[in-house]
Amino acid sequence: LGLETYLQLCGNRELKLENCRKVLEYNEIRIVVQTTELILEIWGRNLEADSRTPECLWIHGEIQSISLTPKGGRHGTAAAR
C-alpha cells in the first residue's frame, strides 16, 4: 500500500516533502528524491536536507526549480519565480 506524496513549498526557501522513500542524490545545487509514485529533482543554491521524521524531508536553500517525473510517466517542471 503506497502513500501519496505531499509537497508544501514556502516561497523559494523551504520545501516540505512527506512520504519520501529514498534520497537518490544530494549536493548543494541538486537533490533527487524518490517517492512511491514520483522522482523529484530540486535545483537551487545552498540546498540542505533535514529529516525530522522518517517519512518527512525538509529542503532548505534557494529553490530555483522542482521537476516531477511520475514513475513510467511524463516529465513535468515547476520553476520558482
What are these regions (language model features)?
Residues 1-25, 30-81:
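Mature-chain termini and adjacent capping regions
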